[in-house]
Structure formats: structure tokens, C-alpha cells
Design a protein with these regions (language model features):
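Flexible "stalk/tail and boundary" regions
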Residues: 1-21, 25, 35-93, 97-98, ...
Length: 155
């Protein structure tokens, strides 16, 4: 996707798909091969909502921070809590030669990840879920997604 930001045009990745993966003995996650090029500039992993992890390409993280977090009012308690959630929980890393990233223990604990995970595209970032949690979330969403879409489309 191409977007305009101030004086500059930029290409924003659109991360799609669902991939079953397994963490190795050192808690490294292999990113799907077809998505790795989006993460060449670096990776930011942070706590996500609903018990998952958010995995941002460096450029998408910067855009997310500029659009969402930098605009928060530091005098608001809710804003400070949300900023802490993302910043304190974040970990910067690089892909290794095999396309892997290291997931820290606090991040693994947040997502209650054991070894089997699902990597799901979420437009400009990836979500990493414990495989069993992903199955539950998908089953819960299955019957209600049409109703949610209809409600959200109302003016």
C-alpha cells in the first residue's frame, strides 16, 4: 500500500495470512519467509491486546508511535498507562540469518505462549498467538463477526 505522510510518499506493508509456527529451544520465532523482507530494517515486538503479541516492522512501529502514542496527553493517567503498556513491553530486535527473532520471557508470559504459535497478519503488523488461544479466539469470532461488521459500519 502507498501512503502520503506530510512531504513524503512511503510504501506501507500489508501483512496478510495465517501461519502455524513453533518456537525453538531458545524461544526464537521464525517469521514466514514471504514476509521477512518487510522486517529488513528491524523488528519491534510488544505486548498486544487480547493476549497476543504485536510484531511490527520498524517503519510501521514508527508510524504507529507517531499516529497513536505521541499524540497522547502525558497529563492523562489513561494516556500514561497506555504509553507504558506499549513502550515498557516493547523489545527491538533484528532478524537473524534464518529469519528468526528472539521473544523475551516477559513477552512470552504475556501471551501465555508455550511452543506452538500462530502468526497472523494484521495489516501493518503481525499478531503472535499461542496456538490454542488462537483457535479459541477464531471460534468465538466465527459466529459474531457479521454482526460486529454491521454495527461498525453504521454511521
Amino acid at each position: 500500500m502507498v501512503g502520503y505522510c506530510g512531504e513524503k510518499w512511503e510504501i506501507t506493508p500489508v501483512l496478510l495470512g495465517e501461519y502455524a509456527q513453533r518456537l525453538d529451544a531458545k524461544n526464537r520465532l521464525t517469521l514466514p519467509a514471504k514476509l521477512r523482507s518487510y522486517f529488513a530494517e528491524g523488528v519491534v515486538v510488544t505486548k498486544g491486546f487480547d493476549g497476543c503479541l504485536f510484531v511490527f516492522p520498524r517503519g510501521s512501529w514508527n508510524s504507529f508511535v507517531e499516529a497513536r502514542l505521541e499524540r497522547l496527553d502525558p497529563f492523562s493517567g489513561e494516556s500514561r498507562r497506555l504509553s507504558r503498556w506499549f513502550y515498557a513491553g516493547a523489545n527491538e530486535c533484528e532478524l537473524d540469518g534464518q529469519g528468526r527473532i528472539m521473544l523475551t520471557q516477559p513477552l512470552l508470559q504475556h501471551a501465555k505462549v508455550d511452543k506452538d504459535v500462530v502468526v497472523a497478519g494484521a495489516r501493518d503488523y503481525l499478531e503472535v498467538w499461542d496456538a490454542e488461544a488462537w483457535s479459541r479466539v477464531q471460534a468465538e469470532s466465527e459466529g459474531s463477526v457479521e454482526d460486529v461488521a454491521e454495527r461498525l459500519s453504521q454511521p
